[in-house]
Amino acid sequence: MLVIGLTGGIGSGKTSAANIFSALGAGVVDTDEIAHELTQSGGRSLPAIRRAFGEKYITPEGALNRKEMRNLVFNDTDARRKLEAILHPLIRDEVSRRVGLAQGPYLIIVVPLLLETGHYRGIVQRVLVVDCSEGAQISRATARSGMNEQAVRAIMVAQVSRDERLGQADDVIVNNADLPNLERQVRALHKKYMTLAQGS
């Protein structure tokens, strides 16, 4: 099966693009979605997170306290590595399981840090980057997450630069406009990927 790695900076529109691909019939595996499942109440990562970080980072409902953890890991590299050491193996296991079950003519794996970690480069045949201006990233990310501009910029600095991301892309979606514009670009790529999938 043809496997596409979909990536992009915070607020670029990765999830919106993935949802359109899914509606067109592509298989979609989203690593952010998996991470949320692992860290919600009853999630498989929580016992290890509780042991490593303490009750302060668990909500009264038993889920990861994302705000507290975000504040910690952006100021403490060791804490970030410790959290990644817990989450990343669990995410990779679940990605492998879902890839094995995937239906559809081709598969999109949504990996925000595809180029930073390199974890999934071995299973993707193409890299699709969703790109947008820095201003669009900041306004979307602050509106969606409730983070302030400073927090969003801190995340952007931790990610590879736009130029570096675009330099590693096989395909690019430019998401500076509206949803119909995004849909047109996704439909064009869907046609391309259907053709490539038939040849693979």
UniProtKB/Swiss-Prot annotation:
GO function terms (MF aspect): ATP binding; dephospho-CoA kinase activity
GO CC term (a single one): cytoplasm
Pfam families on file: CoaE
Binding site for ATP: G11, S12, G13, K14, T15, S16
EC category name: transferase
Catalytically driven reaction(s): 3'-dephospho-CoA + ATP = ADP + CoA + H(+)
Biological pathway: Cofactor biosynthesis; coenzyme A biosynthesis; CoA from (R)-pantothenate: step 5/5
Entry keyword set: ATP-binding, Coenzyme A biosynthesis, Cytoplasm, Kinase, Nucleotide-binding, Transferase
GO biological process, one term: coenzyme A biosynthetic process
Protein's cellular compartments: Cytoplasm
EC assignment: 2.7.1.24
Superkingdom of the source species: Bacteria
Stored InterPro entries: Depp_CoAkinase (IPR001977), P-loop_NTPase (IPR027417)
Sequence ranges assigned to domain DPCK in this UniProt record: 3-200
SUPFAM superfamilies tied to this protein: P-loop containing nucleoside triphosphate hydrolases
Family listed: Belongs to the CoaE family.
Protein name per UniProt: Dephospho-CoA kinase
Gene that encodes it: coaE
